[in-house]
Amino acid sequence: MAYPFQLGLQDATSPIMEELTNFHDHTLMIVFLISSLVLYIISLMLTTKLTHTSTMDAQEVETIWTILPAVILILIALPSLRILYMMDEINNPVLTVKTMGHQWYWSYEYTDYEDLCFDSYMIPTTDLKPGELRLLEVDNRVVLPMELPIRMLISSEDVLHSWAVPSLGLKTDAIPGRLNQATLTSNRPGLFYGQCSEICGSNHSFMPIVLEMVPLKHFENWSASMI
């Protein structure tokens, strides 16, 4: 989860988020190098009155500043395309969960189980227990098995929503009349928080998402107790 004054991304919990973090660092380094070069050239132009007459009309320079940006864009695009294809892969999910966005709560249905469905509302600040997080706790958490591929089917009952869990690298739009899907795999157990990430009305800020990733045995015990 995020912390006050945090500058970086949240700790990666899924393979996809690890790839996104590496891509972020890769792209940021390229941007940093380009920005440093541009600032260096600007400082030279401001601190010297000398000019090189041949650079005002130099075919070689124009060729270089055409080819070099193209190479840099390719270096950014190739890892990005690889991650996009990874995010679209569906590797035989062991579990499918359907989530529907409402104003202003989420409902979940475990499609592999009969009658295993519930609504998930934010817990009001006045009802929080010591140690719980304001605007992020819910009355019913989404319990899922860790280290296994899970498919999420996401849609909406009313307006546009967006189901997002940053530490898993997930953000999928919930669109009325359309069923979007995403896959997630958690590398470790724990609680992972997210929120609706699409403006959906006056209580948009009060639609938290809480995933509880547990070992498979604990998940089986939980699902048996819920049915």
Curated annotation (Swiss-Prot):
Mitochondrial matrix side stretches: 46-59
Cofactor comment: Binds a dinuclear copper A center per subunit.
Residues holding Cu cation A2: 196, 198, 200, 204
One GO location term (cellular component): mitochondrial inner membrane
Enzyme class: translocase
Biological process, per Gene Ontology: ATP synthesis coupled electron transport
Keyword Transferase: no
Membrane-topology descriptor: Multi-pass membrane protein
Cofactor dependence: Cu cation
Chief site of localization: mitochondrion
UniProt binding sites for Mg(2+): 198
Record function comment: Component of the cytochrome c oxidase, the last enzyme in the mitochondrial electron transport chain which drives oxidative phosphorylation. The respiratory chain contains 3 multisubunit complexes succinate dehydrogenase (complex II, CII), ubiquinol-cytochrome c oxidoreductase (cytochrome b-c1 complex, complex III, CIII) and cytochrome c oxidase (complex IV, CIV), that cooperate to transfer electrons derived from NADH and succinate to molecular oxygen, creating an electrochemical gradient over the inner membrane that drives transmembrane transport and the ATP synthase.
Name assigned to this protein: Cytochrome c oxidase subunit 2
